[in-house]
């Protein structure tokens, strides 16, 4: 009897467990949704259930894409108040109201409406819309699409209604682990034509530009031929709605992040592809250059004033604070003279995102649009835009951006004197300046030449050769200068391959037909005798398929040359940062390059006769042979140690900003882990296609490392991936590589993997430790006034070459 009772008890417990983890089709008054249960859409595209975004006892009811990893939540019911009781459940009342009940604590959340109904149910559609439906009329009594969260899904809409003062907006999460309402709203405006805004409180944060039939004119990839997933309708009664229809992809979404970014995703079959994000760069942020300021969109965005305008505050402008904008250099004279020869006229500027505060004039043609503005002295600018018609500006031109290709033609009213100018005066000034500069340069060049001649006269022609003998570098050839000059066509510009940190590199061909690369040390560079001798001696002792091979050297008078094997494909940066050539290295090839560099590092750190710390590992020092195999080059800054030594300290900090580990940049301490840090930066560059010294994200100017950490924390890093690789990558492999890259750039050297561990991480699928949030110490820029190479000499430390 006891045995039978025990079996019955076990069966009951098993049945309860099975039911508690089951998936329901609908929620009714008789069948609520308990914690552990889920509600799936008909074709199992979406799922409703309880979840915890921060892996705590805090539970929320939400909707997410079913069977996608990581989970992407698109709507949350109880955003402001989580439940903590495991007995909580989602129910539907007899009056059609959805209720989230937290055990004995009562109602936590309610849909807030009641209906006269004989019966109703809640079900989840394949568009991700949770609906309460009347069982008799089949009419939707309530739906989640009317109460948006942070995500816009297929067939959902942003709306406004001036008569009722109602609007439907996106509201960001407070953080990526806190779904309560954050600081940002995404909405459309009631002006005609409407435009999209991200608002931070009551302050504009980002603007889409006015709607033009099928596109937003302020989003660069939406040109005149664009037909995308949006439709916008505005009526004369003061209401409008923007609907998102994405028919080309099964899964897609538009999310307003906790940091105020609009991100557009689509599932390409291999994972989420981030195909648009804003704001991202300076010009994306609302009013970055202030009134009458123009933000020029480029790899290094910059502000300038429209023609005829000058900075309102020159001092603030010089400090990089452009928000004060610009003011007119010469006031208009429209009222006094509107038709004569000295009347104001219009200056045209192309590829413009239409500024804010426009007014819709009519759908007339371009010439009539021009005439309307000419005869209205309050009209400061106009634009005739396909899909809109005539827009005019009677207020300050705010949030104007100039794109590199797409955009609209904007005509700005200027005083006649600003357009005519004084050409003769400009010519005279230019001639005087040119002549003065020529004379200064001539005298300077003559003085430098005289000093060089006098200095060289005191140097023995064979001084360098006496310091370096063939027996010191077995296997290397000594070339004479005449041979190298013939091979490189006397170092002609047509033979120049590029400019390195310590000089120029030229392509050459020896008499036997062998192609070579010649590194010619610049006399003005920071690499002197120590680095040059170091590179020759070191590289002669290293042989590995992922290290560049040196063939010989040439030392005559002040000339110092290194002769390398020629790399057909030059350096990795020529591919990675070129908009066309980057397409030649898909994800499998980039992953091979990452592994090849790691193998080269392993040889330097562990497998060679000498332990070598490179100290200047960066993308321009990775050369590619004809099969795109990577080879580490440029050993001028490397250090060699015996097998028991693992770190050293120098007072001479040399390297490249962005790639230098914190302990090396700040204290001069370097080790194998310093190269690991540089490798981590290099990995993130290869994955993203972005340059560490140029990348700047958000209004805070986040570095590539900061953005990689944020991306990995929120989406396992998939939106960091170069968008050109979407069709060739495996998301899990990319996410793993980003995690490895973040492990390599940890602040503490002890938290970084060594080279053996690094290669194991790249070649196996073993579990990886979770990285800590890195310290984003350096944010460098490629400004003309800054050098990419940091060579700060506070003393001299002599290299010591010891056997392993």
Swiss-Prot record:
Alphabetical list of SUPFAM superfamilies matching this protein = alpha-D-mannose-specific plant lectins (SSF51110), Protein kinase-like (PK-like) (SSF56112)
In this chain, where does the modification Phosphothreonine occur?
650
Supply the alphabetized keyword list: ATP-binding, Cell membrane, Disulfide bond, EGF-like domain, Glycoprotein, Kinase, Lectin, Membrane, Nucleotide-binding, Phosphoprotein, Receptor, Serine/threonine-protein kinase, Signal, Transferase, Transmembrane, Transmembrane helix
InterPro entries according to UniProt: Bulb-type_lectin_dom (IPR001480), Bulb-type_lectin_dom_sf (IPR036426), Kinase-like_dom_sf (IPR011009), Pan_app (IPR003609), Prot_kinase_dom (IPR000719), Protein_kinase_ATP_BS (IPR017441), S-locus_recpt_kinase_C (IPR021820), S_locus_glycoprot_dom (IPR000858)
CaM-binding as annotated region, ranges: 580-597
Q: What is this protein called?
A: G-type lectin S-receptor-like serine/threonine-protein kinase At1g61500
An example of a GO molecular function for this protein is: ubiquitin protein ligase binding
Residue intervals of the Bulb-type lectin domain: 25-145
> Where are the Cytoplasmic topological domains?
449-804
Extracellular side stretches: 25-427
* Superkingdom of source: Eukaryota
- Its membrane topology, per UniProt? Single-pass type I membrane protein
Domain EGF-like intervals: 279-315
An annotated GO cellular component: plasma membrane
Q: Where in the cell is it found?
A: Cell membrane
Query: Which residue range or ranges hold the Protein kinase domain?
Result: 491-776
Disulfide cysteine pairs (residue numbers): 283-295, 289-303, 369-390, 373-379
Report the active site residues.
616
């Amino acid at each position: 009897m006891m045995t039978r009772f025990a079996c019955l008890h076990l069966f009951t417990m098993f049945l309860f467990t099975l039911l508690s983890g089951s998936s329901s089709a609908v929620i009714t008054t008789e069948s609520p949704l308990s914690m552990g249960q889920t509600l799936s859409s008909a074709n199992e595209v979406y799922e409703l259930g309880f979840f915890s975004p921060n892996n705590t006892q805090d539970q929320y009811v939400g909707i997410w894409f079913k069977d996608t990893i990581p989970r992407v939540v698109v709507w949350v019911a109880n955003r402001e108040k989580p439940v903590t009781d495991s007995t909580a459940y989602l129910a539907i009342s007899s009056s059609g109201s959805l209720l989230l009940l937290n055990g004995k604590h009562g109602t936590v959340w309610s849909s807030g409406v009641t209906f006269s109904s004989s019966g109703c149910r809640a079900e989840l559609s394949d568009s991700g819309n949770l609906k309460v439906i009347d069982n008799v009329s089949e009419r939707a009594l309530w739906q989640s699409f009317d109460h948006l969260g942070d995500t816009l899904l297929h067939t959902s809409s942003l709306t406004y209604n001036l008569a009722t003062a109602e609007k439907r907006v996106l509201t960001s999460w407070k953080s990526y682990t806190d779904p309560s309402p954050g600081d940002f709203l995404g909405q459309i405006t009631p002006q005609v034509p409407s435009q999209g805004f991200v608002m931070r409180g009551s302050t504009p944060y980002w603007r889409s530009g006015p709607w033009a039939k099928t596109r937003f004119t302020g989003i660069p990839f939406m040109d005149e031929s664009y037909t995308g997933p949006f439709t916008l309708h505005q009526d004369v009664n003061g209401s409008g709605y923007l609907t998102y229809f994405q028919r080309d992809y099964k899964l897609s979404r538009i999310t307003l992040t906790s940091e105020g970014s609009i991100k557009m995703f689509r599932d390409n079959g291999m994972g989420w592809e981030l195909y648009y994000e804003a704001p991202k760069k300076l010009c994306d942020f609302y009013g970055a250059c202030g009134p009458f300021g123009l933000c020029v969109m480029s790899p290094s965005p910059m502000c300038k004033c429209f023609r005829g305008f000058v900075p309102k505050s020159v001092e603030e402008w010089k400090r990089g604070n452009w928000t004060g904008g610009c003011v007119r250099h010469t006031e208009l004279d429209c009222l006094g003279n509107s038709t004569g020869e000295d009347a104001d006229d219009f200056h045209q500027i192309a590829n413009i995102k239409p500024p804010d505060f426009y007014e819709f004039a009519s759908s007339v043609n371009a010439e009539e649009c021009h005439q309307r503005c000419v005869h209205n002295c309050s009209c400061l600018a106009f634009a005739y835009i396909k899909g809109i018609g005539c827009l005019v500006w009677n207020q300050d031109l705010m949030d104007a951006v100039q794109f590199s290709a797409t955009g609209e033609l904007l005509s700005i009213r200027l005083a006649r004197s600003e357009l005519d100018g004084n050409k003769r005066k400009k010519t005279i000034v230019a001639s005087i300046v040119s002549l003065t500069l020529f004379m200064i340069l001539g005298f300077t060049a003559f003085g430098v030449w005289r000093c060089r001649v006098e200095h060289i006269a005191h140097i023995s022609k064979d001084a360098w050769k006496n310091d370096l003998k063939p027996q010191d570098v077995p296997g290397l050839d000594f070339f004479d200068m005449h041979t190298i000059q013939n091979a490189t066509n006397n170092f002609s510009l047509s033979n120049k391959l590029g400019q390195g940190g310590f000089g120029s590199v030229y392509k050459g061909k020896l008499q036997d037909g062998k192609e070579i690369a010649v590194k010619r040390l610049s006399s003005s560079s920071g690499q002197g005798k120590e680095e040059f001798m170091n590179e020759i001696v070191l590289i002669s002792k290293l042989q590995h398929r992922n290290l560049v091979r040196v063939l010989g050297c040439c030392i005559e008078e002040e000339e110092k040359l290194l002769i390398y094997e020629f790399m057909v494909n030059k350096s990795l940066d020529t591919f990675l940062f070129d908009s066309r050539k980057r397409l030649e290295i898909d994800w499998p090839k980039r992953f091979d390059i990452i592994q090849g560099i790691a193998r080269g590092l392993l040889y330097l750190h562990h497998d060679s006769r000498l332990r070598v710390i490179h100290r200047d590992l960066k993308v321009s020092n990775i050369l590619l042979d004809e099969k795109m195999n990577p080879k580490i080059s440029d050993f001028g800054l490397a250090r060699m140690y015996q097998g028991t030594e693992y770190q050293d300290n120098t007072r001479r900090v040399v390297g490249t900003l962005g790639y230098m580990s914190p302990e090396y940049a700040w204290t001069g301490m370097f080790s194998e882990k310093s190269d690991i840090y540089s490798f981590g930066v290099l990995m993130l560059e290869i994955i993203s296609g972005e340059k560490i010294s140029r990348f700047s994200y958000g209004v805070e100017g986040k570095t590539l490392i900061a953005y990689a950490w944020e991306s990995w924390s929120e989406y396992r890093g998939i939106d960091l991936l170069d968008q050109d690789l979407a069709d060739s990558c495996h998301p899990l492999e990319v996410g793993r590589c980003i995690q490895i890259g973040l492990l390599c750039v940890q602040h503490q050297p002890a938290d970084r993997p060594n080279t053996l561990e690094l290669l194991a991480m790249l070649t196996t699928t073993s579990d990886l430790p979770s990285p800590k949030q890195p310290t984003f110490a350096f944010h460098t820029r490629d400004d003309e006034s800054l050098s990419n190479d940091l060579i700060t000499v506070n003393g001299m430390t002599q290299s010591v070459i010891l056997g392993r």
